[in-house]
Amino acid sequence: MKDNFNRNIDYLRISIIDRCNLRCIYCMPEEGITNLLPHHEILSYEEILKIVEIGVDLGITKIRITGGEPLLRKGIVSFIERLARIEGIRDIGMTTNGVLLKKFAKDLYNAGLKRVNVSLDSLDENKFRAITRVGLIDDVFEGIDEAKNAGLQPVKVNVVVMKGINDDEIEKFALWSKKVEYQIRFIEFMPVGQNAWKKELFISKDEIKERIENKIGKLIPVQMKKSGPAEYFMLAGAKGFLGFISPMTTHICVRCNRLRLTADGKLRPCLFSDKEVDIKKILRSGASTEEIRETIIKTIHLKPQGMSEHTKPLRPMSTIGG
């Protein structure tokens, strides 16, 4: 399915829960989400599967499960198993904070999950706690190791870089890539939802790369299959790779191929926009398959061309889906 700018839309990111067991400073307010969705307002697994099945008929081949923290939702393993049985789905990934990953990794792999992205913004225990406001970093390290051992590969580690908060660890993360077979991805700090975005916290992809090359060594470009918005490099002799995602300084919108489905049933054409379509309302009104199909097509045609059309969304990131 093509949007109005001839981009092929084949990727659906699904937030299955608005709750999280961390309180990351760029994702949700310090007090957490005070207006958590009641159970009946959240899409059921059956409703999600129906939307996915119709989406597959329109060309969706790739699914990513997000939250909140998706591993908090009951029945997640059996849901992944049902999702993996849908003919036409070629790839299922998950974005998680990793806290519960040790417990679930093997079962998720056996159910059909292909890979995981783990959010980890510090390698230091005290700083990790300051950024997440709660949480034990050892749980995340153990979860990452268990994911790799279970076969959920490649493991991608997402690092949101914030000046004066964790930018002093850029070199530590880069050196870590020499020892581990992970894809460590530096992400520019974005103004999304009700996060604590401040211009003075922003550090660009180019500055991050420059610091690595000045202090550690040359970044060797690497071509990755299905790399999405990330640009990949490696250090000489490294086991892992370094990725850079730069939504603020690079025109990544030109190759955007995704839609987002929120936990409360809103279909969103763009992370950086408040445009959304209430597909849950249509679904629960007894709409036909064709009506749901037309709703998905309508949402695809709402996708903006690029950043110039964006307004900062009012939802916290945890309710949109990372």
Curated annotation (Swiss-Prot):
Cofactor: [4Fe-4S] cluster
Protein EC: 4.1.99.22
Gene3D superfamilies: Aldolase class I
Organism: Thermodesulfovibrio yellowstonii (strain ATCC 51303 / DSM 11347 / YP87)
Statement: the UniProt record of this protein carries the keyword Nucleotide-binding: yes
Gene Ontology terms for molecular function: 4 iron, 4 sulfur cluster binding; cyclic pyranopterin monophosphate synthase activity; GTP 3',8'-cyclase activity; GTP binding; metal ion binding; S-adenosyl-L-methionine binding
Quaternary data: Monomer and homodimer.
Chain's gene name: moaA
Metabolic or biological pathway, per its Swiss-Prot or TrEMBL entry: Cofactor biosynthesis; molybdopterin biosynthesis
The UniProt record lists the keyword Ion transport: no
Catalytic activity: GTP + AH2 + S-adenosyl-L-methionine = (8S)-3',8-cyclo-7,8-dihydroguanosine 5'-triphosphate + 5'-deoxyadenosine + L-methionine + A + H(+)
Function according to Swiss-Prot or TrEMBL: Catalyzes the cyclization of GTP to (8S)-3',8-cyclo-7,8-dihydroguanosine 5'-triphosphate.
Name of this protein: GTP 3',8-cyclase
